[in-house]
């Protein structure tokens, strides 16, 4: 077996190594690891009111700043090909933009008097779930990008955030404080009622989905350092089984890989921050230390 790998950009050498690993892995008929070649996109704070949007490889060896100047937060890939992404520019009137990573072309999508975040993209990439607070409280909205049509999905008087598609985009899960503490709920897109989805933990404040699987963040008891632990758990809409994915530290911002076989997340343990990857089908996990800067949010 032989193949030549080359690039005109020295900074992209890590992707050559990833390509070599993927090809060798496929040649040996081992489980596919195509996720190695995908970009990670994240928002990193520079100061209290300034953050950049950066793309990187999963080891963070390659990094390139795409958006800078002002407070740029909550990047979310707009397509599986990773050519475009959504992000929020938090200025006097928070605005959601769609940007091409290669051309830099930007398109204004929506703006709001309060918070606005694109949290998930439909499988056909035509619709997005948006957390928005046009008045006081946040609710979940469905926005058709092609038709420019906005539909409000939740109307609770408290906090509804972090909407994600499940079950072939027919339902959504979201985080709400409607029972007091934050927890994960589900509802059909075309129906009003919502049901509690997670019966484990007292403070479940974030979630990500793939198909009928949900990974959520649960705040738990304090660890040896005196800090609260935030652990990741996986559940399915089809069973009652709960799978623990982490057991120590502060584990947050989980995101499924495009094939659903891996999850990326941020881990804080003591004074060390790392980007973590869990291979769900193989009980393998990896940590890649963050050298500097606090990450605001991440997508894969």
Regions found by a protein language model. Name each.
Residues 31, 35-36, 79-81, 123-124, ...:
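Residue-level detector of Asp-centered blade-edge/turn motifs that repeat once per structural unit
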Residues 41-44, 84-88, 127-131, 171-175, ...:
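Residue position within the beta-strands of beta-propeller blades
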């Amino acid at each position: 077996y032989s193949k030549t790998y080359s690039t005109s950009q020295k900074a992209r050498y890590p992707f050559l190594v990833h390509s070599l690993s993927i090809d060798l892995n496929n040649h040996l008929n081992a489980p596919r690891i195509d996720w190695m070649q995908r970009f990670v996109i994240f928002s990193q704070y520079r100061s209290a009111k300034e953050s950049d949007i950066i793309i990187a490889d999963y080891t963070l060896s390659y990094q390139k700043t795409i958006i800078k100047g002002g407070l740029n937060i909550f990047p979310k890939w707009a397509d599986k090909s990773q050519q475009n992404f959504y992000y929020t520019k938090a200025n006097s009137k928070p605005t959601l933009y769609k940007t091409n990573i290669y051309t830099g072309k930007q398109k204004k999508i929506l703006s709001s008097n309060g918070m606005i975040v694109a949290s998930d993209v439909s499988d056909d990439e035509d619709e997005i779930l948006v957390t928005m607070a046009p008045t006081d409280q946040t609710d979940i909205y469905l926005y058709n990008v092609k038709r420019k049509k906005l539909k409000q999905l939740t109307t609770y008087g408290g906090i509804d955030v972090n909407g994600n598609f499940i079950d072939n985009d027919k339902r959504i899960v979201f985080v709400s404080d409607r029972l007091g503490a934050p927890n994960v709920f589900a509802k059909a897109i075309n129906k009003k009622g919502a049901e509690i989805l997670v019966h484990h933990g007292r403070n479940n404040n974030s979630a990500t989905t793939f198909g009928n699987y949900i990974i959520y963040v649960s705040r738990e008891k304090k660890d040896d350092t005196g800090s609260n632990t935030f652990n990741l758990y996986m559940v399915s809409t089809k069973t009652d089984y709960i799978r623990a994915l982490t057991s120590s530290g502060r584990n947050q911002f989980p995101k499924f890989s495009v094939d659903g076989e891996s999850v990326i997340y941020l881990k804080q343990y003591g004074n060390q921050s790392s980007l973590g990857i869990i291979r769900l089908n193989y009980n393998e996990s990896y940590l890649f230390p963050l050298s500097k800067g606090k990450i605001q949010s991440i997508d894969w």
